[in-house]
């Protein structure tokens, strides 16, 4: 099969990203296990509050695998399958837009989850059990910054997926060479 060079570059970039995010997911799982041990259930931290404190960090493991590894692998497979079925290749500029939106957006989303998870776990370890006050202190208490950073991360990730999905959908109806 003749794979366009811009597809090869995308495959290489997205596969490397998936490998890195698999490692991040594994390390996030290990760090969660070790960090949760340091914030045990106690009189100051009953079971329900313990779950509320460690859950943000627990979710990083699965999200890193899903949005950082499995989804990029599925998208690379989808693009390759489209080529093998004779769909019109997606343009280099479109793939570049999808890459530069999705990969940083998903990496930032996972990084934000790590930050939030450790914000909660470390807060509990140092005796902060007033969760409303601790949540208000997130991002130094700057709610506008918090909303902006989360908004940028999720918008970039979603826009990257949308660009790729629309381009793939348009290419499905046309055979290569049309």
Segments and roles (model prediction):
Residues 1-178:
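Hydrophobic alpha-helical transmembrane segments of multi-pass integral membrane proteins
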């Amino acid at each position: 099969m003749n794979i366009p060079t811009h597809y090869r570059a995308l495959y290489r970039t997205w596969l490397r990203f998936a490998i890195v995010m698999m490692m991040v997911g594994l390390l996030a799982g290990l760090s969660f296990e070790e960090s949760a041990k340091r914030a045990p259930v106690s009189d100051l931290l009953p079971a329900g509050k313990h779950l509320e404190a460690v859950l943000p960090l627990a979710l990083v493991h699965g999200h890193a695998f899903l949005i950082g590894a499995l989804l990029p692998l599925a998208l690379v497979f989808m693009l390759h399958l489209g080529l093998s079925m004779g769909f019109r290749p997606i343009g280099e500029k479109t793939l570049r837009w999808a890459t530069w939106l999705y990969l940083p957006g998903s990496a930032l989303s996972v990084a934000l989850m790590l930050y939030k998870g450790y914000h909660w776990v470390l807060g509990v370890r140092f005796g902060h059990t007033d969760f409303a006050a601790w949540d208000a202190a997130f991002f130094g208490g700057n709610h506008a910054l918090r909303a902006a950073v989360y908004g940028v991360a999720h918008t970039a990730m979603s826009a990257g997926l949308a660009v790729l999905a629309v381009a793939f959908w348009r290419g499905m109806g046309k055979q290569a060479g049309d």
